[in-house]
Amino acid sequence: MSNLLLALNIDHIATVRNARGTQYPDPVYAAYIAEQSGIDGITVHLREDRRHITDRDVKLLREIVQTTMNLEMAATDEMVMIACQLKPHYCCLVPERRRELTTEGGLDLIYQIDKMQNIVLKLSDAGIRVSLFIDPDIEQIDASYKIGVRCIELNTGKYAESKNKEDRILEYRRIEKSIKHALSYGLMINAGHGLNYDNVKFIAMLSQIRELNIGHAIVSRAVFCGLPKAIKDMKELLKEFRKKDDQ
């Protein structure tokens, strides 16, 4: 049985901090607590408008994170420069729109393969492992392979937000098909977006997925039971469901 890794997105800790313009709660301290609680990695999105995570946060996180740091970022010159200076373990290129509450969908790579190839090359030359956040779509996977990344993160948002069983099954089949196609290229597969304690089960049972990125659900539960307990609960679910896939 392959272990399913869990990375915690701590953007939402920073959102609470910035709502009142205080210095607390500190997402850097949250990362420390998360690692002490068994998390496998820390994910942060440094947005162009710095609405939650700040430059100060990412600099300190790079110094203190002992597992892996995954920097989500837009494909801009500014972010590439910051990433090359910071040298996180991973960078995940994501789409970014100023008015969105959270990332609304995956990258559309079809007409920007050359641009993405150049960005991936710069990041790779800096020693950073690069992934692309894409929808579960065959053409996007083909484009990812052409761009030259070794890892993709499949957007589980439509699956997670499905309003009925039929739609959820349809989206799940798309994810399954996309995983099979990505594996034919030898790509490593992560997944995330919108996953919570109720809908994560069937995604966790897909044994080809290496890591899940989950933030809002864990931080929300932590408000009531604490971050260590919220992480423990999610990790136990992932372990239980991954075992069921092997039975």
UniProtKB/Swiss-Prot annotation:
Classification lineage: Bacteria, Pseudomonadati, Pseudomonadota, Gammaproteobacteria, Enterobacterales
Binding site for 3-amino-2-oxopropyl phosphate: N9, R20, G194, G215, H216
Subcellular location: Cytoplasm
Residues noted as binding 1-deoxy-D-xylulose 5-phosphate in the record, renumbered to the chain: D11, H12, R47, H52, T102
Catalytic reactions of this protein: 3-amino-2-oxopropyl phosphate + 1-deoxy-D-xylulose 5-phosphate = pyridoxine 5'-phosphate + phosphate + 2 H2O + H(+)
Protein family per UniProt: Belongs to the PNP synthase family.
Name of this protein: Pyridoxine 5'-phosphate synthase
This protein's encoding gene: pdxJ
EC main group: transferase
Keyword flag Transferase: yes
